[in-house]
A protein has these predicted regions:
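Carbohydrate-interacting regions of secretory-pathway proteins
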Residues: 1-177
Length: 177
């Protein structure tokens, strides 16, 4: 904690975990990107995330994270939904998506067809199709504010649905989670 704010620099990986379990909740996170970056992502897009519906042990996924549904916070891809799990039905998400994948990933479309994933991602509706994992990447339709400015991500979980809002705009939604 610095100056009354939680600071996550990226120098070390870590998490904040609740002691209690929650069914229906609204998690609001205000964030801004700092200028300094660290290995192994020194020259790559600034990257973070919020793990929702986490369960199991720390390190259960890839030796680092708890199994969960992630709201991605990454330059150019904030609001993507990732399934961070073991590939089983226990960790899955269904979303309405565009008819075709883009760069191997589904893209959220409110009026699209239902698709269920047990791993991988569902990109937010306007993620740049030319996204690259490069420091400072910014897509032409990004809703994130400029580097150093505050952004608000809201993760709303009601029953079996998670809705993701970035700066007040619904960018992604999944159900059967």
């Amino acid at each position: 904690v610095e100056h009354g704010q939680i600071r996550i620099s990226g120098e070390e990986w870590g998490c904040i975990t609740t002691n209690e379990s929650y069914d229906n909740y609204k998690l609001v996170v205000e964030f801004k990107w700092g200028g300094q970056t660290f290995d192994p992502r020194k020259d790559r897009a600034r990257d973070s995330g919020v793990l929702l519906h986490s369960n199991g042990k720390d390190g259960g996924y890839s030796g680092t994270w708890m199994n969960s549904i992630e709201c991605q916070i990454i330059e150019g891809g904030t609001g993507d939904i990732l399934v961070v799990g073991d590939g089983s039905e226990t960790y899955s998400a269904t979303a309405n998506v565009a008819p075709e994948k883009v760069n191997g990933a589904y893209v959220y479309r409110p009026d699209g067809q239902a698709a269920t994933i047990n791993g991988g991602r569902i990109n937010w509706y306007a993620r740049d199709t030319n996204w690259i994992d490069q420091l400072g990447f910014r897509g032409k339709n990004d809703l994130e504010n400029q580097l150093g400015e505050w952004n608000t991500i809201e993760c709303v979980a009601v029953d079996d649905k998670i809705s993701i809002f970035l700066n007040g705009i619904l960018v992604n939604e999944a159900y059967n989670v």
